[in-house]
Amino acid sequence: MSTLSEVKAPTSTEQPATNEATTPPEIKTTFTSEEIQKLLPHRYPFLLVDKIIDYTPGKQAVGIKNVTINEPHFTGHFPDRPLMPGVLIVEAMAQVGGIVMTQLPGLEGGLFVFAGIDKVRFRRQVVPGDQLVMTVELLWIKQRRFGKMQARAEVDGQLAAEGELMFSLIN
């Protein structure tokens, strides 16, 4: 049995044994509000994603938006019957898509903006108290500058909005 004084400590040129080489880096599959703010340039009142609950690198993300009566657009849209404007539902889906785009290898930190929207349809009203669950899937990316995504927004399992979103990387 060895005593503490008999155990040889690593010298300055020796490194303690670790299993870093055999452990692959952990793939992040969720993002908090604070982490989203490090990835997207949007801030209140225009940051429309509260958290990412599922993320598959280079493929898709699922984000959550908790809709509350305290949001400024409800003051005028509409005073006696508050509805989340459709354009903000589309923007919320696009922000979830932005998480996918900004995490693509070699494009980290890039600023992606809307290049177009197609086939957008609104199927259900979104009102204060709803939780909007948005799933955005990358369909393709060209020349590492343009991308197209399929997006869906649901409330309580019911489709609220869907459409195709196009993005462009700006310098």
Curated annotation (Swiss-Prot):
Belongs to the thioester dehydratase family. FabZ subfamily. It is found in: Cytoplasm. Residues 1-22 have a biased composition (Polar residues). Gene3D superfamilies: Hotdog Thioesterase (3.10.129.10). Residues 1-25 are annotated as: Disordered. The lineage of its organism: Bacteria, Bacillati, Cyanobacteriota, Cyanophyceae, Nostocales. It catalyses: a (3R)-hydroxyacyl-[ACP] = a (2E)-enoyl-[ACP] + H2O. Involved in unsaturated fatty acids biosynthesis. Catalyzes the dehydration of short chain beta-hydroxyacyl-ACPs and long chain saturated and unsaturated beta-hydroxyacyl-ACPs. Pfam families: FabA (PF07977). One of its GO terms (molecular function) is (3R)-hydroxyacyl-[acyl-carrier-protein] dehydratase activity. PANTHER family: 3-HYDROXYACYL-[ACYL-CARRIER-PROTEIN] DEHYDRATASE (PTHR30272:SF1). This is 3-hydroxyacyl-[acyl-carrier-protein] dehydratase FabZ. GO terms for cellular component: cytoplasm; membrane. It comes from Nostoc sp. (strain PCC 7120 / SAG 25.82 / UTEX 2576).
